[in-house]
Amino acid sequence: MNNPVFLSGLNKIYSRFDIFFVDLWGVVHNGVECYSNALKALKNIKKSKKIVLISNAPRPSNNVQRFLNKINFRKKFYNLLITSGDLTRFYLQNKNKNKNKSFYHLGPNRDKSLFINLGLKKTSLNKANFVVCTGINNNKDSLNKYFSILKKIKKKKLKMICANPDLIVHRGNQTEYCAGSIAKLYEKMGGKVKYFGKPYKYFYEYICKILKEKYKKKINKKK
């Protein structure tokens, strides 16, 4: 399926699929509270189908689950939760040529769980071999604040790993920039970026790999 199909309700496609991928932010919650109708829909789907929550949160899924618990979104509403943070960790641990080298973290301290037990050393920009971007440091920051640091990163010709490709997010009534906006700005400056998360193919391949291992079934991607 190459083009999106706009539906009036899930009942139009419900019988065609065994597993539903459901985004979190903007679909299930707004960063502050859950949408009651979304919870009702998930509860009905889970009666006979499997639900996989997917998120561009630049943190491990267990960390995101703790946040979901705070807004009363419980495990009973889904089967699996997979984040762009999970994929980023998988890459840094298994695929990254910079393994065991030093990195500079461009992002808030709340995302530090992304790097736990990876065998990587967090360091200053001057000593870094590559950069991991997880977002803006303060929710109210504008992109202009990051021109200076991006120029320094570009001067050192460092590759950037973007752990959240989203450009913006709405937290309640507030709009915030995400790591994707910083990464796109770095690309415009001529920097190299590798993205992990929606809508990139690598993320969905990673999810299908996990599902195949967990449920011992081959995923029919053509459907």
Report the location of each language-model feature.
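HAD-like aspartate-dependent phosphatase fold
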Residues: 1-223
